[in-house]
């Protein structure tokens, strides 16, 4: 899994509503390439078993934007609790070859072409902190600090290949 919820939130969880969303920092390609354009990411969801219709329901219908709708919108679930600083989402934490292969088998077939799957372009995007999909997003390198998962902090040497 590429989403890691904040352990302290899980340990002390006291869900007051039917559903919860962990708002997570998103990183791309490496552990410390921060994607500020898609942060906070609506990552890990939580609910009680009695409220779980399906995993797809949690992913597709339990959204933070639901809280902005009028209470007259009965079609939108509004019993949602937001947990800020809810963890980390590590997206495309793969070697360039694996990213290329992933894009070639991606459900969005429009990304299965050389414009996106070329190894040199992927490496260039990683080295220049650019978005794979040419959406104009520029990412930023951040230092591994106390805001990261404790395991990563304690094992930086083991993960040096994944830190720039």
Where are these regions (language model features)?
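Conserved "landmark" site that anchors the functional core of diverse proteins
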Residues: 2
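Conserved catalytic core of nucleotide-sugar-dependent glycosyltransferases
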Residues: 5-115
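C-terminal accessory extensions appended to soluble enzyme cores
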Residues: 75-164
């Amino acid at each position: 899994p590429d989403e890691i919820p904040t352990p302290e939130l899980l340990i002390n969880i006291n869900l007051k509503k039917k559903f919860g969303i962990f708002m997570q920092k998103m990183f791309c390609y490496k552990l410390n390439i921060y994607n500020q354009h898609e942060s906070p990411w609506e990552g890990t969801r939580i609910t009680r078993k009695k409220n779980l219709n399906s995993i797809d329901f949690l992913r597709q219908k339990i959204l933070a934007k639901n809280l902005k709708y009028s209470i007259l919108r009965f079609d939108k679930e509004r019993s949602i609790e937001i947990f800020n600083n809810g963890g980390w989402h590590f997206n495309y934490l793969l070697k360039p070859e694996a990213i290329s292969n992933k894009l070639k088998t991606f459900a969005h077939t429009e990304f299965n072409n050389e414009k996106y799957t070329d190894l040199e372009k992927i490496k260039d995007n990683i080295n220049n902190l650019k978005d794979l999909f040419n959406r104009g997003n520029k990412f930023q390198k951040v230092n591994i600090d106390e805001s990261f998962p404790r395991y990563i902090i304690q094992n930086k040497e083991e993960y040096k290949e994944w830190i720039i």
